[in-house]
Amino acid sequence: MKKIILVSVLLLISLAATIPVLAAGPPKPGEKLFDFTLPVPAERADRNYLGISGWGKTFRVADIKANLVLIEILSMYCPFCQKEAPIVNQLYEAIEKDPAAKGKIKIIGIGAGNSAYEVEVFRKRYNVPFPVFPDPDYDIHKKCGEVRTPFFIAVRLNPDGTQEVGYAKLGGFGEIPAFLEMLKKSAGL
């Protein structure tokens, strides 16, 4: 009888541990962004771009000085991410050249399963001008539902401190001018 109770308790505990994993899915428009922290970039240019101070070891997306943050979940080993890198760089340039978007829409990358060394190699190889953060243990990747890469999430940073997902999609985003207009609209610009 004690064995049956022990096995039942262990089964319930293991089932309870899997429920949050099963419930996690990709973010959807209209939802609040899942909570996570990122390391403060060592490079001053990256800190300046994000509008965060060099103080502290970590920051949250809500700390970024912007109306909207486009997050790219990527992997340096993903051939689709490699193919998409020049297009995302062109989007970055289009944002920086657009007076309405510059400083109000920011891009960051998160390297799912990638170390700091690996994301730096990716940045150098593909001339990525925006910060890319390591996620070596897939912590952030798991929180966003273990999406395939590249996966893009546009997050509106509201004045009241809330964050709302406005766009979440696997793969490329199509034509840059149309996508930038959609981002500007989501950002309230």
Task: Show the residue positions of the predicted features.
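Bacterial N-terminal signal peptides
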Residues: 8-17
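Conserved segment of the thioredoxin-like fold in thiol-based oxidoreductases
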Residues: 97-136
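Conserved redox-active cysteine motifs that mediate thiol-disulfide chemistry
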Residues: 73-90
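Thiol/disulfide oxidoreductase modules built on the thioredoxin-like
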Residues: 124-128, 136-186
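Short pre-active-site segment immediately N-terminal to redox-active cysteine/selenocysteine motifs
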Residues: 67-69, 74-77, 148
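A short beta-strand-turn-helix
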Residues: 38-69
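Bacterial N-terminal signal peptides that target proteins for export
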Residues: 1-9
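Sec/Tat signal peptide C-region and signal peptidase I cleavage site
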Residues: 18-23
